[in-house]
Amino acid sequence: MGIEESQICNPSDREFLSVDILNIVTSSLSLMGSALTIISYIWKKVRRHRIQKQQIQQQQQQIEKGGLLSSSITIGNGSSHYGGIGGGGGSGNGTGIGAIGGPHGTYKQPTSKLPLLIFMLSIADFFTSFFIIISQSYLINNSKSYSTPYSPDLKIHFSPCIILRAIIQFFFLSTFFWTTCISYYLFHQLSSPGEEKYLLAIFNVVSWGIPFAISMVITMTNSIVVNSDGWCEVAKPMELSLWFLPLFLCLLVCSIYYFRLRRLFRSKFEYRLQINDRLKQLDSTISRRLTLYIVVFVICWLPDVIQHFISFFSKCTFFPLLILQNILTPSQGFWNFWIYSYTNKIARFTPSNDENKRLLQ
């Protein structure tokens, strides 16, 4: 008996059911992790806005007090005495107000776009997990209705299975592209720091627009089909070009940027060895945390890539790999939340210089 005919390549219905349940469990963890990341980001934005508002009010009060103090000196001492002392007082007030209004009003501290990019990635992770839970629960509870078309006479086939698969496809692809955008952004900020006016707009077009176009194509061309197990999957020709190829390219680009980012970080901060070993340790820690987003993406999707490679040469559904795939693939949102939490801890306890603010805060 060949390996393709063995039990390891032909899981039973009960084993497929266990995979579905495992998928729901890991997706639930990812859903909670993504939700916590989203809530944390929004809360930080609201808190920062309140602090900035309070600072502006305090600055205005100090400016008003400074103006009243100048007026009282002028009225109390007369114009001749004000000319001798008021010049010094005016200079003092001017310096005080300048220290308040100048730096805070004109100098804009460098801030990282990384939290916003992680927020967008978390939105994609959240909805991916949400619709996976709905899809798998529907399949377990009513497999017949799950794959039954709404209207067989329509040229374009629609069923709960097809619609949910298209939505999951969209959000999964979005996580691919957002992670790739994050890897590019991190490398760009280290290699040639500076604001790019349309960078976020480009990221949004790439990470939402391309997945939407791909999902529409596979839906409108009836490329989402129901297999013998009741699952919906993309037909082989489309799966290769519109699922596996984007995934493989994103993994490749992220891997390239990961190694380039590590090499660039080491070369850029190598001089700190001669200044302070603690600073080098902090920079090394920051580097590891930042690149973890890329590493998690690669690890979570590597089993899926291997499974696709196997399917090109064999009909074997390698069950151990299928289990690993259903543990890692839906759990990306959970691991991203874990990295986000650690990154924020490092940002909180790291000396607040321009380099760290541009990369983390």
UniProtKB/Swiss-Prot annotation:
- Official protein name in the record: Cyclic AMP receptor-like protein C
Query: Which InterPro entries does the UniProt record give?
Result: GPCR_2-like_7TM, GPCR_cAMP, GPCR_Rhodpsn_7TM
GO MF assignments = cAMP binding; cAMP receptor activity; G protein-coupled receptor activity
Give the UniProt keywords, A-Z.
G-protein coupled receptor, Membrane, Receptor, Transducer, Transmembrane, Transmembrane helix
Source organism lineage?
A: Eukaryota, Amoebozoa, Evosea, Eumycetozoa, Dictyostelia
Q: What does this protein do?
A: Receptor for cAMP.
* Cellular compartments annotated: Membrane
User: What are the transmembrane regions?
Assistant: 19-39, 114-134, 167-187, 198-218, 239-259, 293-313, 319-339
Query: Which residues face the membrane's Cytoplasmic side?
Result: 40-113, 188-197, 260-292, 340-361
Organism (species) = Dictyostelium discoideum (Social amoeba)
> Entry's PROSITE patterns?
G_PROTEIN_RECEP_F2_4
Bilayer topology annotation: Multi-pass membrane protein
